[in-house]
Swiss-Prot record:
The EC number(s) this enzyme carries: 3.1.1.29
Site (Discriminates between blocked and unblocked aminoacyl-tRNA): 10
Alphabetized CDD domains for the sequence: PTH
Recorded family membership: Belongs to the PTH family.
Record: active site: 20
PROSITE patterns: PEPT_TRNA_HYDROL_1, PEPT_TRNA_HYDROL_2
Species this chain originates from: Streptococcus equi subsp. zooepidemicus (strain H70)
Gene name tied to this protein: pth
Protein name stated in the entry: Peptidyl-tRNA hydrolase
Compartments in which it is found: Cytoplasm
Amino acid sequence: MVKMIVGLGNPGSKYQQTKHNVGFMAVDRLVKDLDISFTEDKTFKALVGSTFINQEKIYFVKPTTFMNNSGLVVRALLTYYNISTKDLMVIYDDLDMAVGKIRLRQKGSAGGHNGIKSIIAHIGTQEFDRVKIGIGRPSHGMSVINHVLGKFDTDDMITINIALDKVDKAINYYLQEKSIEKTMQQFNG
């Protein structure tokens, strides 16, 4: 069995630590905690790291395309590594959830998220596991684009770091238990 954990974000230092890159932040934390390093795969346009957990190969991926083209990378890697969409988990930001709230889901629509729209369009299904991390709605008068491409303020960054710890625990639990249902029961709340 092989699994792939994908964090969504935009490449480049300009976007580091922005709200839209919270998926990258989560995968960075996982990779660091598991003492794995990323290597750049220019063919697939992604940073990829891997390890074995309970005799299962786990790939950790950060697409180096922009968010709206994440599906190209995900589809190519699923095909290359012969990974089923049932063994895909995507971590990404969610505007409609309070800052720092996390929610695991088995399937669902894109909910307006362009990275998820791209993945659904390229893999042909909405049925893949995901972890959504709340970044909150823009303040009055701020555009959605400026909000998602903005950085977290100090208080929100503290909240996000707590959320990233929870995501780290949830993903590790998921990889040990091999069950999204059990993980959802344990970590959704």
